[in-house]
Regions:
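Serine/threonine-rich, low-complexity intrinsically disordered segments
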Residues: 4, 27, 466-468
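Secreted/luminal cysteine- and crosslink-motif detector
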Residues: 5, 14, 29, 58-61
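N-terminal secretory signal peptides that target proteins for export/translocation
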Residues: 1-19
Length: 502
């Protein structure tokens, strides 16, 4: 119901009000104005204003590009003055707020967005109303990007039938070894691991699926992905039908990796926004934010928990792997992918990370010629301090190297007991014996980039997925190919692309 200000009764004859009546008339008018304002819908910064600023303003006034000495990607930055020194926001007074005045400026050289279509009248009115209502911030943290605090997006349904296959960058085998979940276009497809038949489709998810994790019971899935350069998201949902959903996190760029602690109570994430985030289970199925770490200068490509959950391990495209404590503090940095001397010298981006089941060893790989095997505690000792720098440089270090010789690098690592698996950009899956690093088997050439890898020790099965959307199931004891299919509903694998010829 819309409240309207009380209307004065106007007599048929024109009567000049007495001086004594004027205060009562003014009181009625003010009361009517207050009623109208009270009925006006409250404008939300996070819901209504942040999407406008993100879409039209942060391209020139964001964290990297700064026009007019002004950023507005966080609420704290938004409130600061730019080169004009005029107040950006004067709560309650749009006409004294540079943010509003620049939107209605008639001069195209000073109007914002500059040299672009102006905001619509409705959008400008929304900004004006928000400032007039007090310019309140209703997000979680005014110091971090408000794009990462905007409401989750509504995702479209996936295509009923795929016209072309999409790269499958994420795969996960259910704890009981019966199913494998694969990333699709706005969906996760779930297949029978024994027969390769499609079981169900979990739809209305982010455009690109980058990481999938089953919770220990197998009843819930955690799915991460987004849209490159624009949006990231983590969703928790029922594995059976995609119901009971919780958007655990939104981010301003792709979420590339998620990992679940061994006790199933903690979740870590990392991605293209260069932030590691941690979440804690709240009750049975809900997750709440715990902490974040912003120590990274490039994309975070993989996260994992160490044995016993004593560390959160982070692989980064900045040539380092960092080790964090369960509370998010930096424990040490592993620099074995950027060496000046020795046979493994060079600077190499890290794409893959895995940990030893029940042991302290960590495995990292990416570009370069070898997989590195190292331990967090020993890496901390070797880092030492400036006082013992010369002595440390003279030492060989504890890292062991397993050659892979993949010119395109290694994109995924996985461990199973005393076995290490590496999926390469050349299309080959390599299997090593631990701890010596002896190459036990090189699986048949799949002639495509391998993007996804999952291993299930109990059933002796490994799943690989390719850039072309092909999923293959392997026997890890014999190296035999069990099944292969195109993970795109409605399409079938071209016979010429099959490794198992009829």
């Amino acid at each position: 119901m819309t409240l309207r200000p009380p209307q004065p009764v106007v007599p048929n004859c024109r009567v000049r009000p007495s001086v004594g009546a004027l205060p009562w008339i003014m009181l009625c008018l003010l009361a009517g104005a207050n009623l109208a304002r009270g009925a006006e819908e409250e404008v939300s910064f996070v819901r209504d204003i942040a999407p406008l600023l993100t879409r039209h303003c942060t391209g020139c006034h964001g964290p990297t590009k700064v026009e007019g000495d002004y950023r507005l990607h966080t609420f704290v930055a938004l409130q600061k003055t730019g080169a004009s020194d005029s107040p950006t926001l004067t709560p309650g007074q749009p006409e004294q707020s540079e943010l509003y005045l620049r939107l209605i400026d008639d001069n195209e050289s000073t109007r914002m967005p500059q040299w672009d279509d102006p905001l619509s009248a409705g959008q400008i009115a929304l900004v004006e109303r928000w400032i007039r209502q007090g310019a309140q911030f209703d997000g979680r943290d005014p110091n971090v990007s408000f794009k990462s605090q905007m409401p989750p997006r509504t995702h479209p349904a996936p295509p009923a039938v795929y016209k072309v296959a999409v790269p499958v960058q994420a795969c996960a085998i259910s704890p009981d070894g019966r199913e494998v979940a694969l990333g699709g276009h706005h969906e996760v497809t779930v297949w029978n691991l024994q027969t390769g038949t499609l079981l169900r489709r979990l739809a209305n998810l982010p455009k690109r699926i980058q990481s999938i994790v089953y919770e220990p019971t197998g009843s819930r899935l955690l799915v991460a992905g987004g849209t490159p350069g624009d949006y990231g998201e983590i969703v928790a949902l029922d594995a059976a039908d995609g119901g009971n959903r919780q958007v655990v996190q939104t981010a301003e760029d792709l979420v590339l990796s998620i990992a679940l602690s061994h006790d199933g109570q903690h979740l870590a994430s990392g991605g293209a926004d260069r932030v590691v985030r941690s979440f804690i289970r709240d009750g049975q199925e809900r997750w709440s934010f715990a902490w974040d770490s912003r120590l990274f200068s490039d994309w975070i490509t993989e996260v994992a928990y160490g044995a016993g959950d004593e560390f959160v391990l982070v692989a980064c495209r900045d040539y380092t792997a960092k080790v964090l404590t369960p509370a998010g503090a930096l424990y040490t940095t592993y620099n074995g992918h950027q060496r000046q001397f020795g046979s493994e010298n060079g600077r190499f981006e890290i794409y893959a990370l895995a940990t030893e089941a029940g042991g302290p060893r960590v495995f990292t790989a990416g570009l370069g010629r070898s997989i590195r095997m190292w331990e967090a505690a020993k890496a901390q000792v070797e880092n030492g301090s400036a006082a013992d720098m010369e002595e440390r440089f003279a030492q060989a270090g504890h890292t062991k190297y397993f050659p892979h010789d993949a010119q395109r690098g290694v994109f995924k690592l996985a461990t199973a007991g005393n076995l290490l698996f590496a999926a390469t950009g050349e299309g080959r899956l390599r299997q090593y014996e631990l701890p010596e690093g002896k190459l036990l088997r090189e699986y048949p050439d799949q002639q495509d980039w391998l993007f996804g890898l999952a291993v299930h020790p109990a059933t002796e099965r490994a799943v690989t997925t390719t850039r072309g959307g092909v999923a293959r199931v392997w026997n890890t004891t014999t190296g035999e190919l069990i099944h292969e299919w195109l993970a795109a509903p409605g399409l079938t694998l071209d016979p010429a692309a099959r490794l198992a010829k009829p």
